[in-house]
Swiss-Prot record:
EC number(s) stated in the UniProt entry for this protein: 1.7.1.13
Keyword terms, alphabetized: Cytoplasm, NADP, Oxidoreductase, Queuosine biosynthesis
Binding site for NADPH: 86-87, 250-251
Glycoprotein keyword on record: no
Organism from which the protein derives: Idiomarina loihiensis (strain ATCC BAA-735 / DSM 15497 / L2-TR)
Subcellular location(s) per record: Cytoplasm
Enzyme class: oxidoreductase
Catalytic activity of the protein: 7-aminomethyl-7-carbaguanine + 2 NADP(+) = 7-cyano-7-deazaguanine + 2 NADPH + 3 H(+)
PANTHER family: NADPH-DEPENDENT 7-CYANO-7-DEAZAGUANINE REDUCTASE
Name by which UniProt lists this protein: NADPH-dependent 7-cyano-7-deazaguanine reductase
Annotated disulfide bonds: none
Active site feature: 183, 190
Subunit-level organization: Homodimer.
Region called Disordered, residue ranges: 1-33
Length: 274
């Protein structure tokens, strides 16, 4: 099926009525294969990973009709056949607003069941009360920030040929807060920070920054941008590689895709812009 036809059914970019009662049918899957095949990703993935979502606008009614509020943490495995389209995720969460449920545990279990069905593989959900999060510090990525460089930038359309390496090998962790791409459907800007931990040919930092900035006019979902960056860097001969992006929230949700061929996902709180 052509990519356009596969995406035509999505509520993203279309006028949508907000549901007033719990409705799992709001969730819409997007096959990951649509954007994996063009960048050389087959069924056997060269990485493991997870899409870590945070939901800040979650509410429902308890058995007595009293509103409950929570922050939700959702982990969608990168191995799932589908990613979850973000607007449909928002509409799904909003469908809880005026529906009654007996316990927090039941709501969490219900979300796990529905999201797992959409993704095509088990999804983990954790709902936290606000009291559990008060006083949490704002996190930052480890390693060296490459943003403060006195360089000229002229490419704002995706250009992997900008990447360059030096002759010797190293292991290092780098990050940038200058990642910006655009929604595949609506063209709305997606702002993010990206972390790169690698062992292999030393990356030219000026070239890496120019490459990341070249996503500025690129249209792709968050998860797909991270996998594209992973593939481009892996093609340089990296022996070990992690790419992890944390995006600013939209519609009460942020998306934080993690991909690595050698380490588990970093455990960290939200960043300054989240």
């Amino acid at each position: 099926m052509p990519k356009k036809d596969a995406l035509d059914h999505l509520s993203l970019g279309q006028h949508t009525d907000y549901p007033n009662e719990y409705d799992p049918k709001q969730l819409q899957p997007v096959p990951r294969s649509l954007n994996r095949e063009p960048i050389g990703l087959k069924d056997k993935l060269p990485f493991s990973g997870v899409d870590l979502w945070t939901g800040y606008e979650i509410s429902w009614l308890n058995a007595n009709g009293l509103p409950q509020v929570a922050v939700g943490y959702f982990a969608v495995p990168a191995e799932s056949p589908n990613l979850i389209e973000s607007k449909s995720f928002k509409l799904y969460l909003n469908s809880f607003n005026d529906s009654r449920f007996d316990t927090w545990e039941y709501v969490q279990q219900l979300m796990e069941t529905d999201l797992s069905a959409c993704a095509g593989t088990p999804v983990k959900v954790k709902l936290k009360q606000l009291s559990e999060l008060e006083g949490e510090s704002v996190a930052t990525f480890p390693g060296h920030c490459i943003d403060d460089q006195n360089i000229s930038i002229s490419h704002y359309d995706y250009q992997p040929s900008l990447l360059a390496t030096e002759q010797h090998e190293t292991e290092e962790a780098l990050h940038s807060h200058l990642l910006k791409s655009n929604c595949l459907i609506t063209n709305q800007p997606d702002w993010g920070s990206v972390y790169i931990h690698y062992q292999g040919p030393k990356l030219d930092r000026a070239a890496l920054l120019a490459y990341l900035v070249s996503f500025r006019r690129h249209n792709e979902f968050h998860e797909q941008c991270v996998e594209r960056i992973y593939q481009d860097l892996k093609a340089l001969g990296m022996k070990k590689l992690t790419v992890y992006a944390r995006y600013t929230r939209r519609g009460g949700l942020d998306i934080n895709p993690f991909r690595s061929d050698f380490e588990p996902a970093l455990q960290m709180q939200r960043m300054a812009r989240q």
